[in-house]
Regions:
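Subset of outer-membrane beta-barrel
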Residues: 1-260
Length: 260
């Protein structure tokens, strides 16, 4: 994966040029997944990370960093069961992403990479052979120490930071709960070919205030998948992605192979 924001010119308060940044990141990863039973599977991913803020200013120099990280995940999906007027099955999953050492953009200073935990679950209401309604709920938390006024968290190792992140918020347990974001969504699927989707994402106003609704649709025919989504901001804080419309197009080569 490669991501770049392009060249960005920086200026001081007087409008005088101070430098140019070209932030970009590159990730190369390899993954392995194993089905441990008919209903449960796990996976692990190891990745090389290169992050380059590419900024040389008048007072400091930020150097590119090279590091590695590990992702660990698990997924459980029950067998389809009858619930009277409909069939159904539920899903549970977890993902711990970006487990890895701290990085240094400035000599003598180290920063935590964004290790995070995701917990999710969902249920499929299988109404008949053509109609299915799926619901999903997900919680996410950064597994890094809370920044403190005295900067004492900087002396914490990345491994200790993962565990201490559950109890180091200055505001106690109530603030720890605010560090969780949550999202839920629903999808209506007809004949495994046409889908309508909606969802909501919420982050505490004290931790960033990202809050938005989403709407979307999808269409699948043979090996071709077309999806679109629209994001609507629900917060007083502006979101750079608000009122954005996204399109995606994908091909399933396995479907093409099966046809032949």
């Amino acid at each position: 994966k490669y991501f770049s924001l392009g060249k960005i010119e920086l200026t001081d308060a007087g409008g005088n040029p101070t430098g140019v940044i070209n932030p970009n990141e590159f990730v190369f990863s390899g993954s392995y997944a194993l089905k441990l039973s008919q209903t449960f599977s796990m996976g692990v991913s190891i990745k090389y990370i290169r992050s380059n803020l590419a900024f040389t200013g008048t007072s400091s120099t930020l150097q590119p960093v090279n590091s590695f990280a590990v992702d660990v995940s698990g997924f459980y999906q029950s067998e389809e069961e009858n619930y009277g007027t409909f069939n159904g099955k539920y899903r549970l999953g977890f993902n711990i992403a970006n487990l890895g050492p701290k990085v240094s953009y400035v000599p003598g200073e180290e920063d935590f990479i964004p290790t995070n935990l995701k917990l999710g679950g969902g249920f499929d209401f299988i109404l008949d052979d053509y109609n299915t309604i799926s619901t999903t709920l997900e919680f996410t938390k950064l597994l890094v120490p809370t920044p403190l006024a005295d900067g004492s968290e900087e002396d914490t190792s990345w491994i200790s930071g993962v565990f201490s992140s559950f109890g180091d918020a200055p505001g106690g347990f109530s603030e720890e709960l605010k560090e969780f974001t949550y999202a839920f969504g629903a999808e209506y699927l007809y004949n495994n070919a046409f889908a309508l989707r909606t969802g909501y994402f919420h982050e505490s106003e004290d931790k960033g205030a990202r809050q938005y609704f989403t709407m979307g649709a999808g269409f699948k025919t043979n090996a071709l998948n077309v999806d679109l989504s629209y994001l609507m901001n629900a917060s007083d804080v502006n979101n750079p992605l608000e009122n954005s419309l996204r399109f995606s197009l994908s091909f399933d080569l396995g479907e093409i192979y099966d046809d032949y």
